[in-house]
């Protein structure tokens, strides 16, 4: 009889634990302890949108940037404390870039007033993402809940694990693979760039000196290029923002994919999905451009997939009373 190696036993244990953790997430997790949590979150997001049209894109980005670093655990929300917490907020992909933390605080306050000590900060991010999408005209879905908050942050992981707007398709695909997501997830989740804004510094190299060639990115539509060069002139502020989707900037629809087909993807990482020769992403972009329902269905599933990345459940982690610091 073949021996059962310790390494195989460990791998099996990890698989069982991982599967068990994901299985513990449920859309009815708070049905008795905080039955109105979804409505509470939606109300605060709706209020925030009245003053800040771009907040929906900002909130979903927080969820994305949280999940890609050690899993969906709310670690991105932790502030520096001068000793044990070196905040992910100060990692290169996040500093002077991620926003919406005040809205998360407002949601947490409202939820704590209704159900003290029950709902995790990471679950608030997941619920706020769904509210942001549906309030912008996108799909609604039953968010799986039951994650708990990590007590530590991983700034180094944020610097290495998060996809960059300057990366090619090979690197983007690898970073998604690293967290258990596939090419369809990559394209579907990139579709969140159908709303929100981006800073000039995230795409200005495409406008004047792409890959140190001294010329603009040849995949950029020339009319769109001229518009972007006016918004982000050489020597201008890198923190000026413009719409990720120039056609319907605050609506969650499939125009993002139509933009890629006409070389109007704002970020290099956007246009790579369509302009990389022979890439499997091209057919997915074409499908989502032609069929908004297909995009919405894939997006919902990919959001669920992303939300399932290594959650802390059971007795692991904690339910923070303040999203900015461990209890």
Swiss-Prot record:
Show the disulfide pairing: 34-115, 67-72, 121-323, 200-232
Residues annotated as the enzyme's active site: 65 (proton acceptor)
The pH profile of the activity is: Optimum pH is 5.5. Retains more than 50% of activity between pH 4 and 7.
State the UniProt keywords alphabetically: Calcium, Disulfide bond, Glycoprotein, Heme, Hydrogen peroxide, Iron, Metal-binding, Oxidoreductase, Peroxidase, Pyrrolidone carboxylic acid, Secreted, Signal
List glycan-bearing residues: 36, 81, 96, 159, 168, 171, 209, 221, 287, 291
Q: Which residue spans adopt a coiled-coil conformation according to this UniProt entry? A: none
Family annotation (Pfam families)? peroxidase
Question: Which residues are marked as site: Transition state stabilizer?
Answer: 61
- Secretion signal, residue range per the UniProt entry: 1-23
Task: Give residues annotated as binding heme b.
Answer: 193
List GO terms (cellular component aspect): extracellular region
Q: Which residues does the record give as Ca(2+) 1 binding sites?
A: 66, 69, 71, 73, 75
Which residues get modified to Pyrrolidone carboxylic acid? 24
Q: Which family does it belong to?
A: Belongs to the peroxidase family. Classical plant (class III) peroxidase subfamily.
* Protein known as: Peroxidase 15
Write the gene name.
Answer: pod
